[in-house]
Amino acid sequence: MKKYITTTLLFASIFSLAQHIEIVPLGVYGGSDESNLSAYLVGEEGKNEYISMDGGTIYSGIKSAINNNTFKTDESSVLKNYIKGYFISHGHLDHLGGMIINSPEDSKKNIYGSPEMIKVLKENYFTNAAWANFGNEGETPILNKYQYNPYTDQEQFKIDGTILDAQIFELSHVNPWKSSALKVSTPTQSLIYFGDTGADRIEKSNKLNEVWKAIAPEIKSGKLKTIMLEVSFPNAQPEHLLFGHLTPKLLMEELNVLANYTGKNALKNLNVIVTHIKPKGDNPSIIKNELDSLNNLGIKFIYPQQGKRIIIN
């Protein structure tokens, strides 16, 4: 009996030490406000060891997080010490401009992404004509601050300086142009972040379908609790003018495809963090209302705010 109690307490202690994933949004919008563009710090709760999912806004987002008491240190410490690397989903400025602007003040770290995205950084941004070459390849002089780590569709790897394992997925963003998603995992929990993406039906691709098939087992087991996915426009936006983005209708269309692999019950209370809203006029409130009215799966929609921590339970 004593041995049983000791073993039970040991497992209870281990379980209590299991950490949740936390997200610190540095930027949440998909345009217009250059001080609040796509960038999310993701890491194990309480460790201050993050991968930055995209890098549209960095410094302004860190400052907002400090003002919200999310971080209790200065901006430079967060930039240099807390951010262990960047995942850049694709080569558009609203997803990487903040990283580039802050590169002179940053510390040495890795950039993870698809080979196509790494090529854009080397040939279009980290060049003498556009900025300076802070990468480890490309035009001379090579400053060697950022180490390029290209990975192909569904390849798995580790995020240096964190506990996180990762897997990259290819997306379609105005076919044939590409974007990507990244799934990150602790031993007990997973999350997947999507860069910009169109719906398979509009893009005439199967990229999202392949992601849904890949992540369905972890959703069914309860390990993957959170999807971070864009909704850029309200439903009124014509489908031929979406430019590789989603509306509430198209998001729910895709989540119902996911439900075909998981069963509808597995998606009840799944966290879907809505990213990349274009904040023109009343778009944010319209998108929220449309998602609520179309939510036939019991999804828990979360609307991130710059600088305010989200804990995934």
PLM features: residue spans?
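Divalent metal-coordination and catalytic microenvironments
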Residues: 23, 40, 54, 90, ...
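Metallo-beta-lactamase
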Residues: 26, 116-179, 296-311
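Active-site neighborhood of phospho(di)ester-bond hydrolases with catalytic His/Asp-centered motifs
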Residues: 52-56, 82-94, 112-114, 193-196, ...
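Active-site HxH/HxHxD metal-binding segment of metal-dependent hydrolases
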Residues: 74-141
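Cap/insert and terminal regions of metallo-dependent hydrolase folds
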Residues: 200-305
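Pre-active-site segment of Zn-dependent metallo-hydrolases
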Residues: 32-87, 97-104, 203, 207-215
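Bacterial Sec-dependent N-terminal signal peptides
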Residues: 1-21
